[in-house]
């Protein structure tokens, strides 16, 4: 189970400054691992990213050609490197996640980032609740499900929320930020473009028979656990 990769610090803009490292950790090293696993007939699960699509034309499924990936000159190095892995990999299960959040105020959690940011953009994006992702992966171990044939699955929560709704929930749980203000993306002076999209969960539900929590319920669960942990 491969969970390492390059996301950049503090964000994906670092990928534009360190493209070689970004490709090494997001493309070449995971491909080497998949080859080794294939040679030894070992199950391989690679945790990747759904940030290879953008815009709201549809809910993107696993069979849609990425429009914010390797072949789009406007996409970020991060997104290109994630798509490049999918192009090159012919073994194991690739799990696409987006904007992960968990039950703690971890500095890489979406909820922590939102709490700390003063400037917010109101967009709707698919997100991944890490405890449920771990439950999904654990099934492959405990039930000895094979992960050898090439496959891709989106693991995100159904019915994603816009940022303003997430803010309402955080305020409800007294985890707000008095400095929050709304801005446009252009005002942030980012180096790299960003992926904004909604991913389909039909394959997760129908093929893998996993019922992911609606995003609002997942966020409420996380916020409850954060409060209990404080």
Name these PLM-found stretches.
Residues 1-27:
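NAD(P)H-binding glycine-rich loop region in Rossmannoid oxidoreductase-like domains
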Residues 65-68, 98-100, 110-121, 174-185:
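A short C-terminal helix-loop "cap" of Rossmann-like NAD(P)-dependent dehydrogenase/epimerase domains
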Residues 3-4, 44-50, 54, 95-97:
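SDR active-site strand-loop-helix element
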Residues 213-230:
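Amphipathic terminal alpha-helices
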Residues 136-196, 230:
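Mid/C-terminal beta-alpha module of Rossmann-like enzyme folds, strongest
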Residues 39-42:
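A short helix->loop->beta-strand "cap" motif at the edges of active sites that frequently abuts
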């Amino acid at each position: 189970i491969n969970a390492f990769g390059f996301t950049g610090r503090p964000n994906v803009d670092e990928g534009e400054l360190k493209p070689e490292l970004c490709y090494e950790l997001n493309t070449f090293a995971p491909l080497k691992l998949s080859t080794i696993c294939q040679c030894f007939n070992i199950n391989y699960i690679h945790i990747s990213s759904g940030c290879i699509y953008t815009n709201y034309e549809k809910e993107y499924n696993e069979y849609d050609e990425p429009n914010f990936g390797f072949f789009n000159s406007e996409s970020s190095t991060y997104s290109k490197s994630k798509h490049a892995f999918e192009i090159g990999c012919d073994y194991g299960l690739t799990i696409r996640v987006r904007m992960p959040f968990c039950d703690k105020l971890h500095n890489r959690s979406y909820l922590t980032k939102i709490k700390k940011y003063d400037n917010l953009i109101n967009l709707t994006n698919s997100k991944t609740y890490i405890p449920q992702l771990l439950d999904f992966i654990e099934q492959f171990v405990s039930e000895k499900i094979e992960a050898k044939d090439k496959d891709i699955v989106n693991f995100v929560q159904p019915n994603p929320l816009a940022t303003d709704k997430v803010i309402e929930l955080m305020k409800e749980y007294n985890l707000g930020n008095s400095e929050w203000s709304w801005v446009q993306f252009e005002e942030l002076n980012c180096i790299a473009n960003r992926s904004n999209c909604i991913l389909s969960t039909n394959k997760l539900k129908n093929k893998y028979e996993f019922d992911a929590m609606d995003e609002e319920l997942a966020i409420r669960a996380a916020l409850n656990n954060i409060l209990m942990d404080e």
